[in-house]
Amino acid sequence: MGKVIGIDLGTTNSAMAYYDGKDAKIIANKEGRNTTPSVVAFTDKGEVLVGEPAKRQAITNPERTIYSVKRIMGMMCNEPKAQEAKKHVQYKIVDKNGACAVEVDGKVYTPQEISAKILMKLKKDAEEFFGEEVTEAVITVPAYFNDSQRKATQEAGKIAGLNVLRIINEPTAAALAYGLDKKGEEKILVYDLGGGTFDVTVLEIGDGTFQVLATDGNAFLGGDDFDNRIVDWLISEFKAETGIDLSQDKMALQRLKDAAEQAKKELSTKEETEINLPFITADASGPKHLVKKLTRAKFEAMIDDLLQETLRHIDTALEDAGLSKDEIDEIVMVGGSTRIPKVQELVSNYFNGKKLNKSVNPDEVVALGAAIQAGVLKGDVKDVLLLDVTPLSLGIETLGGVMTKIIEKGTTIPVKKSQVFSTAEDNQTAVTIHVLQGEAELAKDNKSLGQFNLEGIPPAPRGVPQIEVTFDIDANGVLNVSAKDKTSGKEQKITITGSSTLSEEEIERMVREAEEANRKEKARIEAIKARNELDAVAYQAEKFINDNKDKLGDVSALEAKIKEAKELIEQQSEDKAKIEALKNEINTELQNVAQNMAQQQQAQGGAQQQNQNKGGDDDVIDAEVE
């Protein structure tokens, strides 16, 4: 087995790590940074930018720059959270067969495809680091991700050319990185507040065993929401002062978002920050500038309701774990948003002033934990047992639109459970199994994961047929469902319909497209290198001509090729063969010109010597010596 990397595929930033046999270590990206912005951009020239280069050009290219796509991963477009996401991005979120997707220049991309581009960037950078191909990974997801979101993450990995060995919950990964070397038993609470999601997980750890006791959270609460509060405030303030509404100006909105994110970060170390955006817009009276001061106290007031919600999730997690606040030994803070002083203050106060454990790097610890899990799967990490749980209950819709739970929230995974149901009507020969995830009593209030039909049931009075429904959750937290008529032996496994997951055919197509895009990108980079080499050769040839004007004969052929080279470079030609052929022609022509010049100089030198010799003979006087 080759190298396996651990990947934290984050909402705002992603990170990767590996286990070297002793420790988990972060892999820096090509740009030398330990984290990579989870941003993908499409330029007007057809290039795809990922990471820092994509983030840098977002202001001038807002509609083609995709960020925070994790928020719509595995989500149906009619979900309220999807509608909320649409309001806060400058790119276009569209409906693709009911599921959320993004549209750029008329082409529709699924969140899996966008995420795959981020994963491909990480994969490529890891390969450069190791000097060998990387084909396997452990990828993290928020603990509160549902089945559709987990499957979508697996699909993204597959499109990127990665065999995803395991999907692991982010707080659990953080606990692995925190507790790998801990010898005694501890009950810990991981408070994970990232860019887009919030999870709280209670674990019991000791002697290599990591047992999740309970988990809770909100897959739509994080730093993005804090940024959005600042943006909304800036729009409101600017409108009150100038009468101009910036909410429809995509370029202005992107500038506001970037400024809001920066202000949020500055307020973690400063009491006040100034947001200064010159030329944010213009009207008949001329350009308008936005200059606002934001205090830490004002920012904290803006986001207080969101922070209070995180405390309610701690309540639920502790209740589900059957523990009191005083029984928690350590509170491990994870995720970039835990740097906000108010977050730390609220969590510490919740636990009666208990000191928070900030020994781990909140941006890197999840990737490190994923790398440790990769080490466990490879056999490099011994004596580690990880027992995670399902974050939400799973069941089916039964008579009266009620959800009947088959696997309860907090059940240790992997797990397989069955329950026997029957028909609702006489002589019913088919049943529809509607699979649900959530805690609500009514089916309509839960997340629909899909449905399938079991047909061929022998006619019988209602209540007589025995239909066994089996739910099987694997170690990734991914669900498989089957239904079997015990009388006829007919069995049917779930085929999700109207879901956000992709079919095998779609995944294979996307894999091919990703490989083709990768091939084109390699060809583009090779063409750039070839153009640079051509530019250098053309420059040297032109310099040679300019430096030796008086000594050269006819150089029109060389000058014509230099001109052709400049045109190819100006056009940014990607015809590598043509570029290299022209480079060779210029080199050959330059050698010929240089050779001709040398021969000419040699000939001139010989003629001068002959003239000198002739002149010497004329001066000789013949005389006899006496």
Swiss-Prot record:
It comes from the Bacteria. Residues 595-626 are annotated as: Disordered. Pfam families: HSP70 (PF00012). One of its GO terms (molecular function) is ATP binding. InterPro entries: ATPase_NBD, Chaperone_DnaK, Heat_shock_70_CS, HSP70_peptide-bd_sf, Hsp_70_fam. Induction: By stress conditions e.g. heat shock. Belongs to the heat shock protein 70 family. Residues 595-614 have a biased composition (Low complexity). Keywords: ATP-binding, Chaperone, Nucleotide-binding, Phosphoprotein, Stress response. This is Chaperone protein DnaK. HAMAP family: DnaK. The modification Phosphothreonine is found at residue 197. Acts as a chaperone. PROSITE patterns: HSP70_1 (PS00297), HSP70_2 (PS00329), HSP70_3 (PS01036).
